[in-house]
């Protein structure tokens, strides 16, 4: 599921990281939450409960309830085990007095009917997919959507097989327990969630037919790119999903496979993490900073949280990924943002794979300090370039094309594991026009390429007060060029 560790070089690399963490503390307070003594807390999911309690699930099948995670003094946190004996839940939410979990073999509803603080009713909502014991057969589940459906993405068997029913598919579980096959083409999810509009996205990891890890839109009826599980269309009398051409390019295959929805945002391998995981939408109304309607995406290998700004162009999602939060104690898997209070909760585990954080597991709280960093807030595609929106007025440097540079590339769409960066280009930034309020800049660019990742560096840009960008890079996946 996840890739091998990338080590940070000694010397100057450590100095750069230390400087970045110091800057991060000015904007975001990251605090470890004490864990229960003796508990092996490799967290797989987080659910927010009434009365500011939090439920977490573990790799080994336990459910714990945390009290006090919102308090200023985290040393007073208490824990109570709510359930045990489950099968690696990777999705949890609270609704109408019940805790819903997505386990490897099923979606389950847990209830505490006698009020003693532990679950005594375990009800199977749906178990319509297969498992065979392979370690890779994860099942990630969403909270309920607007219609009450739970979306479940099913990992393949191993890296490239589909030995159990519906592996490599996304299913919707309806409130009355029916299972609806919804999308094919999935490989190795790391998380699933909604954007502010209620559309569903998941993260998929690098591997066969995935040149690099990415964030993907689960449009009903779509093909997500990996054909390994396509054989299961016969189980529901569905039309046979498309057969891609090995060694092609996604932009080429889209022309002949209309069901193929491209990755919304590609995370270039090692540059923007290696194992994207949980997804949290910011609909907090500014309680977590100026990122309203954007997504936060966990990163297991690099122990980070990235920030994603999406847009739709010609009906297709695309957008930019930015570096955001770093320095977590272990590899981040689940994320949950409390949109009422502005607290971001992150769970971590090395899970047998290495992570930069170094610890075997962690549970952490992140709070915005109220100080806004100077950042590129959004990056939006234009017919002949991009528009950047800043979090505060920029200085004159933002109107100088020399303050920016760009390169672009794509990946081989192939059955082999991953892909190098190929078809490289160097788009030329010919003009940079600041808006009257200096909070945005229009970059005119020669050489935009449909289907390429466009990597922007804005290292010469400073704010009106002379502050450099906290993160001066963005990676934009240009699936469509606006007309």
Predicted regions span which residues?
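Beta-propeller domains with acidic blade repeats across secreted/periplasmic ectodomains
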Residues: 23-373, 379-385, 396
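Extracytoplasmic/surface-exposed domains of secreted proteins
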Residues: 384-408, 436-471
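A structural signal for the main folded, soluble domain(s) of proteins
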Residues: 251-259, 418, 457, 468, ...
């Amino acid at each position: 599921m996840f890739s091998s560790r990338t080590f940070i070089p000694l010397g100057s690399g450590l100095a750069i990281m230390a400087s970045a963490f110091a800057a991060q503390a000015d904007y975001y307070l990251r605090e470890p939450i004490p864990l229960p003594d003796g508990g092996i807390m490799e967290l797989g999911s987080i659910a927010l409960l009434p009365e500011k309690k939090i439920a977490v699930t573990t790799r080994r099948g336990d459910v714990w309830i945390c009290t006090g995670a919102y308090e200023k003094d985290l040393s007073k946190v208490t824990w109570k085990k709510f359930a045990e004996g489950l099968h690696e839940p990777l999705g949890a939410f609270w609704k109408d007095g019940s805790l819903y979990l997505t386990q490897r073999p099923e979606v389950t509803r847990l209830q505490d009917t006698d009020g003693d603080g532990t679950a005594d009713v375990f009800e199977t909502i749906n178990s319509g997919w297969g498992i065979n014991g392979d370690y890779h057969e994860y099942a990630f589940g969403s909270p309920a959507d607007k219609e009450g459906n739970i979306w479940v993405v099913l990992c393949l068997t191993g890296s490239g097989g589909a030995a159990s029913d519906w592996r490599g598919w996304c299913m919707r579980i309806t409130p009355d327990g029916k299972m609806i096959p919804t999308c094919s083409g999935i490989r190795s999810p790391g998380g699933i969630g909604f954007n502010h509009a209620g559309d569903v996205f998941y993260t998929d990891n690098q591997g066969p037919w995935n040149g690099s890890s990415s964030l993907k839109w689960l449009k009903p009826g779509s093909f997500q790119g990996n054909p390994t599980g396509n054989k299961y269309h016969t189980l529901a009398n569905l039309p046979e999903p498309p057969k891609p051409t090995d060694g092609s390019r996604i932009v080429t295959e889209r022309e002949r496979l209309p069901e193929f929805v491209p990755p919304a945002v590609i995370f270039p391998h090692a540059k923007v993490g290696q194992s994207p995981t949980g997804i949290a939408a910011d609909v907090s109304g500014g309680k977590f900073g100026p990122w309203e309607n954007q997504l936060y995406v966990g990163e297991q290998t690099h122990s980070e949280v990235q920030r994603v700004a999406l847009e739709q162009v010609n009906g297709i999602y695309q957008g930019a990924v930015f570096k955001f939060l770093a320095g977590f104690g272990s590899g981040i898997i689940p994320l949950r943002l409390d949109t009422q209070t502005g607290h971001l909760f992150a769970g971590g585990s090395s899970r047998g794979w290495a992570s930069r954080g170094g610890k075997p597991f962690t549970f952490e709280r992140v709070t915005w300090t109220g100080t806004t960093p100077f950042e590129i807030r959004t990056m939006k595609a234009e017919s002949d370039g991009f528009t950047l929106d800043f979090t505060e007025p920029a200085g004159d440097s933002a109107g100088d094309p020399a303050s920016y540079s760009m390169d672009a590339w794509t990946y081989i769409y192939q059955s082999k594991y991953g892909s190098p960066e190929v078809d490289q280009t160097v788009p030329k930034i010919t003009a940079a026009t600041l808006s009257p309020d200096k909070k945005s800049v229009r970059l005119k660019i020669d050489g935009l390429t449909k289907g390429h990742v466009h990597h922007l560096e804005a290292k010469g840009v400073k704010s009106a007060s002379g502050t450099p960008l906290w993160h001066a890079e963005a990676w934009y996946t240009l699936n469509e060029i606006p007309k």
